[in-house]
Amino acid sequence: MNKQSIRDIDVKGKRVFCRVDFNVPLKDGVIQDETRIQAALPTIKHLLDGGAKLVLASHLGRPKGEKKPEFSLAPVAKRLAELLGKDVPLVEEAYGPVAEEAVANLSEGDVVVLENVRFYPGETKNDPELAKGFAALADVYVNDAFGAAHRAHASTEGIAHHVDTAVAGLLMEKELEVLGKALSNPDRPFTAIIGGSKVADKIGVIDHLLDIVDTLIIGGGLSYTFSKALGHEVGTSLLEEDKLDLARQFMKKAEDKGVKFLMPVDCVITKEFGEETYVGPVDIDSIPADHMGLDIGPKTVELYADAIRESKLVVWNGPMGVFELDKYANGTKGVAQALADSDAYSIIGGGDSAAAAAKFGLADKMSHISTGGGASLEFMEGKKLPGVEALNDK
């Protein structure tokens, strides 16, 4: 990683504005999954142990620039206090006189949580005035919110231009090192597994990965567009007619580059979306006109598991089927199990793939689960992330 991190600086006695990702799911004010809070703890503890006056900032949900109590970070501040064993007050504003006074009263090793940065319309617009308001609370800026690094917002990008010292937190540093090495200097054989529902969402990542990987595996709803491009009938399965030519181009590129391009050989079909009309697996060229595929079949799972076993590095982004419904979860579960059992270094690209690994109790068997869905996807497309670019170079 060519950016400075908190390991490179002294924070003793300094006001440190740390942008974390506390965007946790809440139900009736109760945190449903605290993975993101846990992921931020090493950075928080490092800064507190170093004697920082710590100011934590995050978004939660999409309040759209209005102060809505259901999007308050109060439950997060409360949980953080329990995890750290110390007071963690919530400041009712994220900038301005109230916030400035709260920060001025901090001693070394103290921490506060600012209220949701998306309560202000200027956050998502990267308003320079709001960015300056945040910067007024800081001697040092730390970005540890990899999950929001692909967005140029006031608290993720704008603030960095108004603070002399802008560095990465430990989580951000790890994400950039793991994903960066995978893309620039991968262990081989290198396999990428791309699933999810739409080709449109994965165009950039498929295109970029075809320049790097040894094997590309396709699954999920987007695989039916590739099947159709090969001349198979896909019934009522998800199909993007306007992406058929692109699918053919990708397969041609794989051939030209000598990349093994694996696609489903069978799939699990149903007459209607749901478990009531479940039929079972059929070969990929035998989908009836009035049926749809909702998961990869057992032969495909075996094919993909073989490829995973032969790999030294595997990046997985996107499920193989509608894993939320048990009858269409076996494909995703099979791939997750193959990854868990393999010796390969496995990188799970956030979002649905991470949720699937957790659902099947296999998360702790994966080498690295990215905390950023959209951010890891854009990084794997070879794009620059605004929240990273704004940090100080080493």
UniProtKB/Swiss-Prot annotation:
Cytoplasm keyword on record: yes
GO CC list: cytosol
Enzyme nomenclature, EC number: 2.7.2.3
Name by which UniProt lists this protein: Phosphoglycerate kinase
Gene of this entry: pgk
UniProt record similarity statement: Belongs to the phosphoglycerate kinase family.
Major site of localization recorded for this protein: cytoplasm
Protein's pathway: Carbohydrate degradation; glycolysis; pyruvate from D-glyceraldehyde 3-phosphate: step 2/5
UniProt keyword list: ATP-binding, Cytoplasm, Glycolysis, Kinase, Nucleotide-binding, Transferase
GO molecular function: ADP binding; ATP binding; phosphoglycerate kinase activity
Protein localization: Cytoplasm
Subunit structure of this chain's protein: Monomer.
Reaction(s) catalysed by this chain's protein: (2R)-3-phosphoglycerate + ATP = (2R)-3-phospho-glyceroyl phosphate + ADP
InterPro entries per UniProt: Phosphoglycerate_kinase, Phosphoglycerate_kinase_CS, Phosphoglycerate_kinase_N, Phosphoglycerate_kinase_sf
Source taxonomy: Bacteria, Bacillati, Bacillota, Bacilli, Bacillales
Keyword Nucleotide-binding carried by entry: yes
UniProt: substrate binding residues: D21, F22, N23, R36, H59, L60, G61, R62, R118, R151
